């Protein structure tokens, strides 16, 4: 194989190497950063939960905690398998809009592409997530992720493997049309994973990057179910009116993303929650 010759190894060995690197890298970020947050707050400051926890009175029972970690580990390995295989496909000359030489599109475009990719991945995640909240998909797949009403850092990818595959594909779709440097894409995947871990941490966090919603934005998604579908940003929820409203009722059975009216709303201005 051409790519095998280029790296001085057989195709199978190259594939195995890429899958191993992607899997180990993913597991190290996930359990390294997630584990550190868990130890720092859930272990060391458990008795002072009111000071740091978004839902200070809610902790997962031990069996659900262990189940969440097992499912997440399987999904991270699945993610490594997919990402490594995708890298092998690209190295072998498979089609994508990724490029390796920054001079090919210029430095200015490469910098702009960071923003474009971020918004494209966010859009992809928002619409996929909204789709997962349709009754059938929610009941059969997305319900797994919503078993964690008070999520911990380990629950970021505690989800049905079918859902994990859907989200993984949705994150990869933009790079088939948007030219992006390969390192920008890899960096973006790590960035999104780290912020996702913070957003599932259950810890009160106000991100230093001003475009990010606070960690309460996604934590509320787990409490109220069908609202706040965005991943890092509240933009798409604001645009579609799916941001949580103080004046509406939400719950597992209230589908549609806009809650249910509590009383007569005639003439009333919607009261959206600030995150
Ligand atoms: Zn959801
Ligand atoms: Zn979640």
Question: Which residues are covered by each model-predicted region?
Answer:
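Short acidic/polar alpha-helix capping motifs at helix-coil junctions
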Residues: 106, 137-138, 180-182
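Functionally important transmembrane alpha-helices
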Residues: 178-239
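Residue-level detector of transmembrane insertion/anchoring sites
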Residues: 112, 119, 136, 150, ...
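Acidic (Asp/Glu-rich) catalytic motifs at the cytosolic membrane interface
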Residues: 124-150, 199, 203-204, 212-226
